[in-house]
Amino acid sequence: MSDQDKHEQLRIGLVSPEQILAWSERILPNGERVGQVTTERTLDYRTYEPVRDGLFCERIFGPKKRGVCACVKPRMMENDKENYNSNFCTQCGVELAIDPRIRRYRMGYIKLACPVVHIWYFKRRPSYIADLLDKTRKELEDPVYCDVCITRPTAKKPTLLRFQGLRPSKYESWAEKIAYYLSWDFGLVQEREIATGGKAIREQLAGLDLQMIIDRSYIEWKEIDEVISILFSEPENLFSNRKIYAQFKEQKLQKLRRRKDLLVRRMRFAKYFLRTNVEPQWMVLCLLPVLPPDLRPMFQLNEGGVITSDLNELYQTVIRRNNNVLQFIETTSAFLIPDLLPDQKKLVQQAVDALLDNSIGTQPVRDSHDRPYKSFSDFIQGKEGRFRENLLGKRVDYSGRSVIVVGPLLSLYQCGLPREIAIELFQAFLIRDLVERQIAPNLRAAKFLIRDRGPIIWNVLKQIMQKHPILLNRAPTLHRLGIQAFIPVLINERAIRLHPLVCAGFNADFDGDQMAVHVPLSMEAQVEARLLMFSHLNLISPTIGDPICVPTQDMLLGLYRSTLQKNQGIYENRYHPNSSKKKIVSPSFYSYDDALKAYEQKQIDLDSPLWLRWGREIDTSIINSVNRELPIEVQYECLGTFYEIYDHFRIRKGRVGEILNKYIRTTVGRIRFNREIEEAIKGLWTYDIRQEMLLFRI
């Protein structure tokens, strides 16, 4: 459907019977109203032409071919030239000048003999109908399927049912109570005093006051909240058996919480109906829309048989049972058998349920091969449904798809793009650059160069890709982080490389997941990708505000291993006179570079303890505990200088106690980790300074 601004959109919701009639009924040029499907037949199997008023009727849904009507007779009759109309056949009622593609969107309708409850709003969880009526789904199931009847309140007027002691709005068995009143006027009694099936549910929904439901539900919710607070405040010491009281208290709390949840749902549903101007009784169908025939096709085989969509079989069942109900209502003899008419209405309800959703019921309707029919819900839901397969899953130009693999060496805003995909996606940009740089004289020569895949092609392609972001998307795109922008990097593999930290936003892992690649073409799309969609700009979850790019378990284990230190500590230097091994002395280094060079030359290990000269101030307040940390050992030298050795650092002091130098206890792994942190902070500080300078210039 289209809104006032002519923007194409799709909205799923409830509509009134009048709106269904406006969509599916129309007036022919001769003044006849068409749109109602009255017969279950589809094609005449002798001529393979659509049957009049059937599921493929050309009067209702439009012609199969332009200019050819259903009667296939000459258009011009010599004796009827005055009444001749080239756009309409007066004999069969088919409009000839209409495009046959109209059979893809022109609808019909079935006028149901009895109202039918919509299964989506009754059997799905939560049940809209059950919650609004403040009943359980099990309580409503018998009235919906005509197993019990509901007595109607008729004010103070005497009724036959009231003489038997029945109270208004009470469920009673159809066969037991109605058998007393069988007569030729039974139809009048039924219409006045009892109701069952969708008609009874529709009357109850029509009598609801939505604003009153909201007010009363809120008052009851507050009362239950007060009761729960009282239960929590009661001391258990007042009761002799605490265990039994605790069980009773927990059961009572669970019951109250379930009631609170139901009240919240009732208020929310009532607000939805009020906000959208939708009536609750529209959840009960009086008119059943019939899909356009091209959306439920029927094909003729070469052998002479016909294959058809499952929807046609389900529609035929609905029409057949609906016609049976109409036939029973027209004959007065039907009222002599009390169970006959309700059973027929129950069959109509079950047929419509199978048409709308064949998977909710206890026993799905099956074909002759014991295969469940595909209902309307099956055609639109899931990965192969109409929305995800045909509407959202269309093929797009300048796009590709491949499996994702981990790329830990990439930056957060980079992704590895296979050469085969990159040269196809950026071929237009590549041809333009080759011609502009005069590497190729024309378009044809540029294509030959690209086909040869020479080194110059890859160099030009790298330069193009550095300036052009790409979009990565993983279906299903449930939130805005499902599609993000990256700077592509050429790789020789055939899979897309992705940084592991961005997988949380995509809800992806590396067990065979695939991602789609898109190239933004317009300048607006490229600006949006750079300013809003880059992965390093989307580090916070849009729903709850928590960080979404957090270190994974592999990273944490790697950091733990790289910063691990051997357990000996400074006691590694202690002298053992009885030991046959030589005394081990931890090496000392003047700078980061000296320690890293020693590690590269394999003189020390990654976790070997070492002393590193530290030119900065040591914050002893962090190291000292409440009792103030004392030196573990003090070593004196012959010239009067001495070392104060602590657990993680040592200080060399002069004769009068002045500090000469400081060394900290660390490892090569910790040095590398500290350097990475310093470079990251320095880069962030430089980025902030540049941003401030840019703002100052502006």
UniProtKB/Swiss-Prot annotation:
Cofactor note: Binds 1 Mg(2+) ion per subunit. Binds 1 Zn(2+) ion per subunit.
Family statement drawn from the similarity comment of this UniProt entry: Belongs to the RNA polymerase beta' chain family. RpoC1 subfamily.
SMART domains: RPOLA_N
InterPro entries assigned: DNA-dir_RpoC_beta_prime, RNA_pol_asu, RNA_pol_N, RNA_pol_Rpb1_1, RNA_pol_Rpb1_3, RNA_pol_Rpb1_3_sf, RNA_pol_Rpb1_clamp_domain, RNApol_RpoC1
Binding positions for Mg(2+) per the UniProt entry: 509, 511, 513
GO-annotated biological processes: DNA-templated transcription
Annotated protein name in UniProt: DNA-directed RNA polymerase subunit beta'
GO molecular function, one term: DNA-directed RNA polymerase activity
Matches recorded under Gene3D superfamilies: 1.10.40.90, 2.40.40.20, RNA polymerase II, clamp domain, RNA polymerase Rpb1, domain 3
Binding residue positions for Zn(2+): 69, 71, 89, 92
Keywords attached to this entry: Chloroplast, DNA-directed RNA polymerase, Magnesium, Metal-binding, Nucleotidyltransferase, Plastid, Transcription, Transferase, Zinc
Reaction catalyzed: RNA(n) + a ribonucleoside 5'-triphosphate = RNA(n+1) + diphosphate
Function per UniProt: DNA-dependent RNA polymerase catalyzes the transcription of DNA into RNA using the four ribonucleoside triphosphates as substrates.
Xref: Pfam families: RNA_pol_Rpb1_1, RNA_pol_Rpb1_2, RNA_pol_Rpb1_3
Keyword Nucleotidyltransferase: yes
Catalytic activity, EC: 2.7.7.6
